[in-house]
UniProtKB/Swiss-Prot annotation:
This is Fibrillarin-like rRNA/tRNA 2'-O-methyltransferase. S-adenosyl-L-methionine binds at residues 89-90, 108-109, 133-134, 153-156. Transmembrane segments: none annotated. Pfam families: Fibrillarin. HAMAP family: RNA_methyltransf_FlpA. GO terms for biological process: box C/D sno(s)RNA 3'-end processing; tRNA processing. The lineage of its organism: Archaea, Thermoproteota, Thermoprotei, Sulfolobales, Sulfolobaceae. Its EC number is 2.1.1.-.
Length: 231
């Protein structure tokens, strides 16, 4: 197995590149819970710090960063509402990024899947799993404070509408929303790019400022990341 040669900072807060002696480079985050991995990712020790490899094929946010994402508003201390947390792959890396000063409110609909999420969160005091349906934020509004970012990955035909509805409840003014759009969940007959543009137009018409629309191929086929600012 190749050995770590150095770790360098990226343009984004608490996101790093691990460079190995065989010339390969991998995205990584500092492990908030040393000794524990989440989805079988490699743990890398360098300079007295443990990092977790961040697999771009397992995380849409990692894929977006590798693809050249320009706007990543997630920083140390950010408060995040994550819709569609699943078993915690991407939320755990966000947990690393925001550190203990931040919070990751992690909403998941499946009782089976949230059991896995709870196992992840027990080692991460800044993660707060919530068993709920993202279509009905009124049922978890007492559990979530106003947040800096709403991150959405729920693969529903009305994902954009669900995202905007949650933003009305929880997103601070001048906060950001990041939406992972799966075009095939919206319309299998249309060209994915046409769908991305249509979803961005919905957001713009609702008063959001479009910062970026980034296609995620080859890491996630027929997906795009849309980043908007709440004016």
């Amino acid at each position: 197995m190749s050995e770590i040669e150095k770790v360098t900072k990226t343009q984004f807060d608490n996101v790093y590149e691990c460079i190995f002696n065989d010339g390969t480079t991998r995205l990584c985050t500092k492990n908030l819970s040393p000794g524990h991995n989440v989805y079988g990712e490699r743990l890398i020790k360098y300079g007295g710090v443990e990092y977790r490899e961040w697999n771009a094929f397992r995380s849409k946010l990692a894929g977006a960063i590798v693809k050249g994402l320009k706007y990543n508003p997630i920083v140390k201390g950010s408060k995040i509402l994550y819709l569609g947390a699943a078993s915690g792959t991407t939320p755990s890396h966000i947990s690393d990024i925001v550190e203990l000063q931040g919070k990751v409110y992690s909403v998941e609909f499946s009782p089976r899947v949230i059991r896995e999420l709870l196992l992840v969160a027990q080692y991460r005091p800044n993660m707060f799993p919530i068993l709920a349906d993202a279509r009905f934020p009124q049922y978890y509004k007492s559990l979530v404070e106003n947040v800096d970012i709403v991150y959405v990955d729920i693969a529903q035909p009305n994902e954009t509408e669900i995202a905007m509805y949650n933003a009305r409840f929880f997103l601070k003014k001048n906060g950001y929303m990041m939406i992972a759009i799966k075009s095939r969940s919206i319309d299998v007959t249309k060209d994915p790019r046409e769908i991305y543009n249509a979803e961005a137009k919905k957001l713009e018409d609702a008063g959001f400022d479009i910062r970026e629309v980034l296609e995620l191929d080859p890491y996630d086929k027929d997906h795009a990341m849309i980043v908007v600012k709440y004016k």
